[in-house]
């Protein structure tokens, strides 16, 4: 559902021109063949740039980005994470994924390879909303913490939680849950944060 924000580039809102939109093949097809998204392309509000699984894009002399597929609902498009490489540091960006165990890679090993790991923290635990959590699959923060339980403080400190549902109590900076998680060595992204790459 995150693609819905593209509508704000159209003539009803910003009326932008040629905003680059990096899209995997299935997402490109969806945007090209469905309204109102195809109108954004026809009116040149957005310009689709093709990306491929595990194919590195060099954005400039200081920044490389590699998209990779992750398992998620995928009703309308692929779901991807990104490895982002700067001149000094590297980050992992996975805002959406079903569960860590459904991915064909070890999240622990992938985190160890980077300086920062921005990870899906949609829900704190399975009791957060009053419906079947299988309808909105995401790794609970508590599951991620359990996976990293025996890892070093340095490894835990690379994990920066992002992508919170409004029901997640850890979204609140002064919540008991957030403070307990931070004591374990994990971090939370905040609006205005900057991370050197």
Where are these regions (language model features)?
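Short active-site oxyanion
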Residues: 16-20, 91, 158
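Phosphate- and divalent-cation-binding pockets in alpha/beta enzyme and binding domains
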Residues: 2-5, 30-31, 170
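A short, active-site helix/loop in glycosyltransferases that binds the activated sugar's phosphate group
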Residues: 26-36
């Amino acid at each position: 559902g995150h693609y819905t924000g593209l509508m704000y580039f159209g003539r009803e809102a910003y009326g932008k021109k040629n905003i680059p939109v990096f899209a995997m093949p299935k997402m490109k097809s969806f945007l090209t063949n469905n309204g109102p998204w195809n109108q954004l392309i026809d009116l040149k509000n957005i310009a689709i740039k093709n990306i491929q699984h595990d194919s590195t894009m060099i954005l400039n002399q200081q920044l490389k980005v590699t998209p990779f597929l992750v398992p998620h609902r995928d009703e309308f498009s692929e779901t991807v994470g990104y490895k982002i490489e700067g001149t000094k540091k590297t980050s992992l960006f996975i805002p959406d994924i079903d569960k860590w165990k459904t991915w064909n890679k070890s999240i622990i090993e992938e985190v160890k390879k980077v300086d920062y790991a921005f990870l899906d923290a949609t829900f704190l635990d399975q009791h957060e909303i009053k419906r079947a959590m299988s309808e909105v699959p995401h790794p609970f923060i508590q599951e991620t913490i359990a996976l990293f339980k025996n890892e070093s403080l340095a490894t835990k400190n690379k994990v920066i939680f992002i992508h919170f549902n409004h029901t997640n109590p850890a979204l609140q900076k002064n919540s008991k849950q957030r403070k307990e998680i931070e004591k374990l060595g994990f971090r939370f992204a905040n609006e205005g944060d900057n991370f050197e790459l």
